[in-house]
């Protein structure tokens, strides 16, 4: 099969849980982002043990943008750590649905210890050169359009954790 020949058995195994995401557009963003991590040879784990059927009340494009930004930020941080000589980097993510119209996504990645999280969501505040990293400000702007979307993130013991809960 095309996927097996081009991705390898270990990559296909890592994508296995995406089969539980029953929305093709949502599933494709996870496959795309996980493949990007795989291509950069970064350790990762994705878990989606529950069937994702009824999406919560959020525009699908907004949900995909938030998930995409979270993965892009994690991947960029891990690549930057690699360039600075830190080879032990990883990205772990999880998608979970315990009831219809509820959804939780969490991504946790290796990060610099001095990452300051209390200002990252402010527009124009970034840890990146040339102020390229406005992703979390964009995430906050999107989340603020909804009363049922909760965003949380923290940096602890060399890991950055980003969570979105939608009820």
Annotate each PLM feature.
Residues 18-21, 44-66:
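Conserved short strand/loop->alpha-helix "switch" segment adjacent to the catalytic nucleotide/phosphoryl-transfer site
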Residues 18-40:
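Short beta-to-alpha transition helix within the HATPase_c
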Residues 46-50, 97, 111:
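Heptad-repeat coiled-coil segments of the DHp/HisKA dimerization-phosphoacceptor module
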Residues 60-84, 145:
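Conserved ATP-binding N-box helix of the HATPase_c
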Residues 84-100:
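Short beta-strand/loop element within the Bergerat-fold HATPase_c
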Residues 100-133:
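Glycine-rich/acidic phosphate-handling loop/turn and adjacent ATP-lid/helix
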Residues 138-150:
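Conserved glycine-/histidine-rich ATP-lid loop and adjacent helix of the Bergerat-fold HATPase_c
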Residues 158-167:
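Short C-terminal beta-strand
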């Amino acid at each position: 099969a095309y996927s097996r020949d081009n991705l390898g058995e270990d990559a296909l195994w890592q994508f296995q849980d995406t089969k539980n995401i029953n929305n093709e557009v949502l599933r494709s963003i996870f496959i795309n982002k996980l493949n990007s991590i795989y291509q950069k040879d970064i350790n990762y784990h994705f878990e989606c043990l529950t069937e994702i059927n009824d999406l919560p009340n959020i525009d699908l494009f907004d949900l995909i943008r938030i998930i995409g930004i979270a993965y892009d930020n994690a991947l960029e941080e891990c690549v930057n750590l690699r360039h600075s000589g830190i080879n032990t980097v990883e990205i772990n993510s999880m998608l979970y649905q315990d009831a219809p119209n509820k959804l939780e996504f969490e991504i946790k990645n290796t990060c610099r210890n001095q990452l300051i999280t209390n200002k990252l969501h402010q527009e124009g505040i970034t840890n990146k050169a040339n102020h390229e990293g406005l992703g979390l400000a964009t995430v906050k702007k999107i989340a603020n359009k909804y009363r049922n979307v909760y965003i949380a993130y923290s940096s602890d013991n060399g890991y950055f954790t980003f969570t979105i809960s939608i009820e």
